[in-house]
Amino acid sequence: MTDQVFDKACRACPRLATFLDDVNQRYPDYYCKPVPPFGDAAASFLIVGLAPGMHGANRTGRPFTGDHAGLLLYQMLHKYGFSTHEESLAADDELRLTNCRITNAVKCLPPDNKPVGAEINTCNAFLGNELSTLAESSVVLALGGIAHRAIIKALSLRQADYKFGHAALHDLGRFRLLDSYHCSRYNTCLLYTSPSPRDGTK
């Protein structure tokens, strides 16, 4: 069992490690490694996504940076004072987060954006350690059902007691868990997400 919140050299999931190697061959300028959490280490607001996107975090090395989902997310973070900029384009830009931290349930890019159960479980110890650093009365935002379930698992809670639902708020004792549909292009195009529902989760 690891006590880390991140391991940049992790290759514990053979399928993901092989896939990253293949992607790196096709896109040699891409980051193509486990993507670390980003933001304020002492934040009381933690955002948990699913996994790095092919041409977003997997390219730039920073969560939700350089793709459609990031455009939507950082616009909201900037609007409510958590981000210095409303666009996150590259890991070396000047964007900084205040009292906010962003991570993923799975730290490596999965094929077709779909990690399998064993991969989610392998990465779950990192997420559990990250959750353990949160202060009392913090808020965790789960972007999507997989992120929600990974959080519940990391806390050793019963999934049946905490069902995922868009805009659902769960009291987990030490902090609260807020659910939202993931702000991916796919969900947005299907009208599952839009700026107004996300505004309602502030």
Write out the residue ranges for each language-model feature.
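A polyanion-binding, active-site-adjacent surface
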Residues: 1-164, 173-188
